[in-house]
UniProtKB/Swiss-Prot annotation:
InterPro entries with a match to the protein in the record: Ankyrin_rpt (IPR002110), Ankyrin_rpt-contain_sf (IPR036770)
Signal peptide (residue range): none
Cited PANTHER family: ANKYRIN REPEAT PROTEIN, GH09064P
Alphabetically ordered keywords of this record: ANK repeat, Repeat
Pfam families named among the record's database cross-references: Ank_2 (PF12796)
ANK repeats: from-to residues: 40-71, 76-105, 107-134, 135-164, 165-194, 196-224, 225-254
Protein's UniProt name: Putative ankyrin repeat protein R791
Length: 287
């Protein structure tokens, strides 16, 4: 019945939204020839992998073994695995690993990709395949960079040293503002060099209010370098940080008003408005 429908009708059908088109074309193997008309709208293999259609991927592989498929753009196994990691498709990952004999050569890169996206179940699958410590540490860095605590805990529980490379991981977590990760790392033995004022300066500059608060609690000098943390926060428009540090005694005029001048000339509007109110109330109080 379907084969008797004129091509013009099929072309109209294929102009539906992409989800409807894909769901239609994947319902019957006889529809595969129609991908020739739809291939400019989407990548067939991409959609198969993104949606976790293992049975269709198997069928495509069977067809490819018989000869090249002109209606499907080719992808190497490495790219297929990375795409599956991106979309958290563990069944696709397992199928690709089980059907490719040379998969060991790319396991390392794939676990790093899975960690980047926080795909904990995929990371766990690859850890069981004897991944070396250097790769696991790189995976930990990727998970930390993107705030994936659950993935980090899995990697740490599998032997990665959280204090390696001079406590690099906790430094990275602070620089990204991931307070939950910082607290977890501290609770599990990582240390913060609280004498290093770059932590509180950078956190204030980026507007990480909770991180600034935590670093102060841990003993960081919030008045370091002529009150640079509060001045950085002011220049960045992070008024919650400014107000917090002011409540502790920090001074936005500590550098002889050069920061004030900069903000009025180049700073964000909210900081300018804050300074106007600040000086207005100061004039009332001080006469």
């Amino acid at each position: 019945m379907y084969l008797n429908i004129p091509t013009e009708i099929w072309l109209c059908i294929l102009k539906m939204d992409i989800d409807s088109t894909i769901n239609l074309l994947f319902t019957n193997k006889y529809f595969f020839d129609l991908f020739e008309f739809a291939k400019h709208n989407f990548n067939v293999l991409h959609e198969v992998i993104k949606r976790g259609y293992v049975h269709i991927l198997k069928y495509v592989d069977e067809l490819e073994n018989l000869g090249p498929l002109v209606f499907i753009e080719t992808m190497n196994v490495h790219d297929k695995l990375k795409l599956a990691c991106n979309h958290d498709q563990l069944p696709i990952v397992k199928y690709l690993v089980e059907t490719n004999s040379n998969i060991e050569t790319i396991n390392d890169d794939v676990i790093i990709t899975a960690s980047f996206y926080g795909r904990t179940n995929i990371v766990e699958y690859f850890i069981k395949k004897d991944i070396d410590n250097k790769t696991i540490f790189e995976a930990l860095k990727n998970a930390c960079d993107n705030g994936h605590l659950e993935t980090m805990i899995l990697l740490i529980n599998n032997g990665v040293d959280i204090k390696a490379k001079d406590n690099f991981i906790i430094k990275q977590a602070i620089s990204k503002g991931h307070l939950n990760i910082v607290k977890y790392l501290v609770e599990n033995g990582a240390t913060i060099d609280i004498e290093d004022d770059t932590y509180i300066i950078n956190s204030a500059q980026k507007g990480y209010y909770k991180m600034v608060e935590y670093l102060v609690y841990r003993g960081a000098d919030y008045r370091t370098v002529d009150d640079l943390p509060i001045r950085c926060a002011l220049m960045g428009g992070h008024l919650d940080v400014v107000k917090y540090l002011q409540s502790l005694g920090a001074d936005i005029e500590a550098d002889n008003e050069s920061t004030i001048d900069y903000v009025f000339k180049h700073g964000p509007n909210e900081s300018k408005e804050y300074l106007e109110r600040y000086f207005y109330w100061n004039s009332l109080i001080n006469g």
